[in-house]
């Protein structure tokens, strides 16, 4: 009997050690401490959920450093974020939609404050129709039930190993600090945090441009410094109050500032040749260019939910989003050598604030396995851009306004939307289908008596998703959704804006929004020690917005926003997570697609076609060693990608980290080696090429490799419960 009791006790211990999530939630134990690890990726009917803690290489960074590791996300050398090859996607913060530029919004969120990232590639009718490639929902950390959470990090970057012998920005600085605090007790739930990040980057640029106007061939290759000084800081506060068993209030406030100065000090070798006579002339000049941008981002929301009955819930939310954006571009052309004579100087100050308001009402009725959802949303946003261009030539002391490059543009959008969605789950089959109707009115007005533009649109956005479990751990799903990419101030502004010495940008007030239909077929397979997902998708985009080039004069190219025909994209996305033994955790994701675009440019005068295969690979290999040491190697690779008039070159960034965690999990110490290169000249480099019948331009951007960072983190989670049973993949499945 004693042996039997011992055996049963041993068996019970083994079961709680290896399958603790099978224990009932209400089991009260006081002397057992259970350890477990959540899976890196989990699934819901309409989304994949990625654990932020799996990506140690993103520590001390922001949300961009995290999401670039997801299978369908890529970030190029210019910092542009693409989801399935498109920069048009919507960012949610804890389910609250944002309207600003995704890169600007994500840069305000410290990576250490993020719990999960939800990827929704086929959003239903209950979601906004914005974002043609889907939705990314950032879930931030909160306090445990009836407990306290305190988490902080401090980072210090090492001096640069390669500053390219730059003359202006000689000492890039990198340091960061953040703190998050959460508290939950009774009916009250509070979370707050503050973060600061300074993340300069040295860089170098080499380019070549040539134009042909009549018989004159002009070439102006250039090279020189292209560095960044940048920082951002912000605070966040959210509160939830359970008034009673049926009613709850929630409020949240996010506010942050982002600042960036980009310097481009370039030596130009300008030469002209008459193709008929052979006559040539040349001269050199030095272009000193500084682009300063800053903005304050604010997101405030107030919401309530009301349980009308056991099956019916009504919720309301009111949200304000503001972005006070300012910029100043200074451009000086100096004689070379010597740099003593000013040939021309221009300044280009601008303000472009965004104010957006949103009201939502949602009704959910759930009876058994059937769920009805209906809702209404009103959106109003206004963006007023004031773009000023002044110049002075040699010998002049006063700046003169140039009306050709100066403008005021105001865009106002009124959007009324309603939706109806039905969902049903029975046995192995679950599905949802819905329809969203949207009435939009875009009003565009300009300064200087330029006629405005009024665009009313009525669009329907149908969607459906079907998921069927072939077996206990294997499911297939098929979906369709229709999405929209709206236009912004820069894309609509018909006045040319002088970006720097060799380029200007110009919009089109008649520009139409992009409309995209997305078909998807996927499979989810839960493995014994991981998971595998694969999705085949096809996108058709009507009125794709392209930024194309044409010659403005012999030394300036004009970048013009225009609708360009029809774009199609067919691809496969896959992600594998697998644990090999107790040491090795691998996460390998990738996306490969064929992009095909064809149509006409410049009012039908120039037919074009271009296509290419594009692929990206994001891989993370983690190793858990003895005494709480861990290593992680991450690789992000983006292949060459075709554009309307050229191609964007490949981009490769490997990263490595070493981490030591104390036994009580209170402290961690980490060293990071970012943009690993070791003198090979292959990391953090990208070439952009564009060509036309009478011009050619190519630019190679070389950014600082081999960045080293050291950090210390503190983590305290205090729970007022005697035992906590962490969720596992099995428990998530049952839930």
What role is predicted for each listed range?
Residues 119-120, 153-155, 160-164, 217-223, ...:
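Extracytoplasmic loops and strand-loop junctions of Gram-negative outer membrane beta-barrel proteins
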Residues 202-220, 270-284, 329-346, 382-409, ...:
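Surface-exposed loop/turn segments flanking beta-strands in extracellular/periplasmic regions
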Residues 373-472, 601-602:
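Signature of Gram-negative outer-membrane beta-barrel scaffolds
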Residues 592, 597, 614-662, 667, ...:
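C-terminal beta-barrel architecture of Gram-negative outer-membrane proteins
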């Amino acid at each position: 009997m004693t042996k039997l009791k011992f055996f049963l006790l041993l068996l019970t211990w083994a079961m709680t050690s290896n399958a603790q999530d099978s224990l009932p939630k209400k089991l009260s134990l006081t002397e057992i401490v259970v350890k477990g690890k959540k899976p890196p990726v989990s699934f819901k009917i309409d989304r994949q959920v990625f654990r932020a803690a799996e990506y140690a290489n993103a520590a001390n960074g922001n949300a961009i450093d995290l999401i670039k590791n997801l299978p369908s996300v890529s970030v190029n050398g210019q910092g542009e974020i693409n989801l399935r090859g498109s920069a048009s996607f919507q960012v949610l913060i804890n389910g609250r939609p944002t309207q600003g530029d995704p890169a600007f919004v994500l840069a305000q969120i410290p990576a250490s404050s993020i719990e999960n990232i939800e990827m929704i590639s086929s959003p239903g009718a209950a979601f906004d129709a914005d974002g043609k490639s889907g939705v990314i929902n950032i879930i931030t950390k909160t306090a445990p039930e009836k407990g306290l959470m305190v988490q902080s990090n401090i980072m210090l970057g090492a001096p640069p190993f390669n500053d390219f012998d730059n003359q202006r920005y000689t000492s890039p600085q990198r340091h960061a600090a953040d703190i998050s605090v959460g508290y939950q007790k009774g009916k009250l739930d509070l979370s707050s945090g503050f973060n600061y990040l300074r993340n300069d980057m040295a860089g170098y640029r080499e380019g070549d441009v040539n134009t042909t106007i009549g018989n004159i061939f002009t070439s102006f290759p250039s090279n020189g410094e292209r560095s960044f000084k940048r920082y951002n800081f912000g605070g966040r506060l959210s509160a939830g109050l359970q008034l009673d068993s049926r009613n709850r209030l929630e409020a949240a406030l996010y506010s942050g500032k982002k600042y960036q100065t980009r310097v481009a000090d370039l030596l130009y070798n300008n030469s002209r040749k008459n193709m008929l006579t052979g006559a040539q002339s040349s001269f050199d000049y030095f272009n000193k260019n500084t682009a300063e941008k800053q903005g304050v981002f604010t997101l405030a929301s107030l919401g309530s939910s009301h349980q009308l009955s056991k099956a019916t819930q009504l919720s309301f939310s009111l949200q304000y989003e503001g972005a006070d954006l300012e910029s100043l571009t200074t451009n000086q052309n100096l004689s070379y050598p010597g740099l003593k004579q000013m040939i021309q100087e221009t300044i280009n100050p601008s303000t472009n604030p965004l104010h957006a308001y949103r009201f939502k009402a949602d009704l959910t009725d759930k009876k058994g396995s059937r769920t009805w959802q209906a809702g209404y949303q009103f959106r109003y946003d206004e963006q007023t851009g004031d773009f000023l261009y002044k110049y002075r030539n040699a010998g002049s002391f006063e700046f003169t306004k140039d009306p050709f490059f100066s403008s005021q543009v105001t865009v106002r959008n009124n959007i009324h939307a309603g939706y109806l969605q039905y969902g049903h789950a029975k046995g192995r089959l679950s599905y949802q289908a819905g329809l969203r109707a949207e009435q939009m009115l875009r009003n565009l007005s300009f300064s200087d008596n330029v006629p405005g533009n009024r665009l009313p649109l009525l669009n329907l956005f149908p969607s459906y998703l079907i998921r069927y479990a072939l077996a206990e751990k294997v499911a297939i799903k098929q979906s369709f959704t229709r999405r929209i990419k709206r236009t912004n101030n820069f894309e609509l502004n018909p006045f040319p804006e002088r970006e720097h010495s060799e380029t200007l940008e110009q919009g089109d007030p008649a520009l139409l929004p992009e409309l995209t239909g997305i078909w998807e077929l996927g499979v989810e397979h839960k493995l014994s020690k991981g998971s595998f997902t694969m999705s085949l998708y096809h996108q058709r985009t009507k009125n794709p917005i392209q930024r194309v080039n044409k010659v403005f004069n012999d030394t300036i190219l004009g970048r013009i926003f225009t609708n360009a025909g029809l774009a199609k994209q067919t691809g496969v996305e896959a992600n594998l997570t697998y644990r090999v033994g107790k040491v090795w955790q691998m996460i390998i994701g990738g996306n490969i697609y064929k992009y095909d675009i064809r149509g006409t440019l410049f009012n039908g005068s120039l037919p074009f076609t271009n296509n290419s295969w594009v692929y990206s690979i994001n891989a993370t290999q983690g190793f858990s060693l003895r005494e709480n040491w861990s290593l992680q190697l991450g690789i992000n690779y983006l292949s060459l990608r075709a554009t309307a008039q050229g191609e964007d070159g490949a981009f490769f960034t490997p990263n490595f980290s070493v981490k030591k965690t104390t036994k009580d999990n209170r402290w961690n110490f980490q060293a990071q080696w970012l943009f690993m290169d070791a003198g090979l000249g292959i990391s953090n480099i990208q070439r952009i090429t564009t060509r036309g019948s009478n011009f050619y331009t190519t630019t190679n951007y070389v950014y600082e490799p081999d960045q080293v960072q050291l950090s210390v983190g503190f983590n305290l989670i205090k729970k007022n419960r005697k035992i906590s049973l962490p969720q596992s993949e099995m428990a998530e499945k049952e839930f």
